[in-house]
Amino acid sequence: MKARFALLAAACALLLSSLPVLAHHSFAAEYDGNKQINVTGIVTKVEWMNPHARFYVNVTGADGKVINWNFELGAIPVLLKQGWRKDSLKEGDHVSVVGNIAKDGSHSANARNVTLPDGRRVFGGSSAGDGDTK
């Protein structure tokens, strides 16, 4: 009886410990697949690290107000297969980004495609799809 209880407790602990991992990888939990954003601006910061690379872009709105957008990219191995390199984006680069905005209303998005300063359009490694935009 004690062995069965210990086994059940261990199984429950394992199951519960995996929930944060599942939540982390849920595009639908954080981003709205039906709401795209298409912006152009200046890169202010690049974070090339796992589990997902990120970059930040200052975008000037029609009212002249500058908003700093936070864009999530895919995992580093996925980005490397898509042609990304650690130095593909640098602070000061002028880029265009198509992505899906965060559900929480913040200035965050999952980058689907990024047009780099040299004109190359690269897939952002989004878990939302293959990079095709609507």
Region spans (language model):
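Short, structured beta-strand/loop micro-motifs enriched in basic residues and often containing a Trp
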Residues: L73-K81
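Short nucleic-acid-contacting surface segments enriched for D/E, G, S/T with interspersed K/R
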Residues: K81-S96
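Short aromatic-glycine-enriched beta-strand elements
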Residues: M49-V59
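OB-fold/S1-family single-stranded nucleic acid-binding modules
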Residues: A102-S126
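Bacterial N-terminal signal peptides that target proteins for export
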Residues: M1-A9
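Bacterial N-terminal signal peptides
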Residues: A9-P20
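Conserved hydrophobic positions within beta-strands
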Residues: G41-V43
